[in-house]
Amino acid sequence: MDYEFLRDITGVVKVRLSMGHEALGHWFNEEVKGNLALLDEVEAAARDVKGSERQWQKTGHEYTLWLDGEEVMVRANQLEFSGDEMEEGMSYYDEESLSLCGVEDFLQVVQAYRDFLAQYG
């Protein structure tokens, strides 16, 4: 999973992730927005569920993050509809609306984000 951090013309830090992980970048950009307390909460939850069958979720304004001991999923809240409601030819999986990755990979991105903010924030 490749990622990069950018500062836009207004000084806001933006996160971009590789294809298939775009929703994770959107989660950082829409939900985190430099809120290190939210990252603290997510990291603590990752430690709590590690090695267990438990799951944890954090619902935001635009995206919801789920995690268990092995995997992290970020999904756009707008995807909360049943298959019957989908238009013909539409797929539930939209690369920019749903991302899955391993917990360790996710935590590496979180740490890199923190490091970027500390250096350039």
Swiss-Prot record:
Belongs to the UPF0231 family. Transmembrane segments: none annotated. It comes from the Bacteria. InterPro entries: UPF0231. This is UPF0231 protein ESA_03214.
